[in-house]
Amino acid sequence: NLNKNKKETIFNHDLKINSEKYLEVTNKLIPTGKIKKVKNTINDFNNFQNIGEKITIIKNKKIKRVSNTINQLGFDLTFCIKKNSKNYLASLKNKKTNIQLDFYSNLPGVQLYTSQGLRYKNKLAPYQGVCLETQHYPDAPNNKNFPSTLIKPNKLYKYFTKINIS
């Protein structure tokens, strides 16, 4: 949450994700193995999009999202990152506070979670946080069309995530 008052929602945050595809999931949020295109869908964040507007569209159109497991609507989805030389992943900004986070990683995916299910001892409420979690594709060992997560002996693996704050 990039607001000064952390009790405010993330509805005034804008998000951009370097992705043309996302992982389809079951109603239990398990990847089906299908990779879907984001173009012309509610999941398209290729240009900065307001998170609050996207969630409002989901609610108003009553789009059934698989993340609606606890009667809340929002995002809980893995995006497949487009490969690029600078490892650019995503940007999150708040125009009101003028804070921006730019994410870089060599991992192939990022999980977007808009905290629709967030409840913590009356201190946190739904939509008071947003998570961008760099990762391999969930359930990759069971989906041969996903990038491999097999770790071989005597081979060095280096993964990084970098966040620039401005």
What positions do the PLM features span?
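An exposed, glycine/acidic-rich loop-and-rim segment of catalytic or binding clefts
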Residues: 1-166
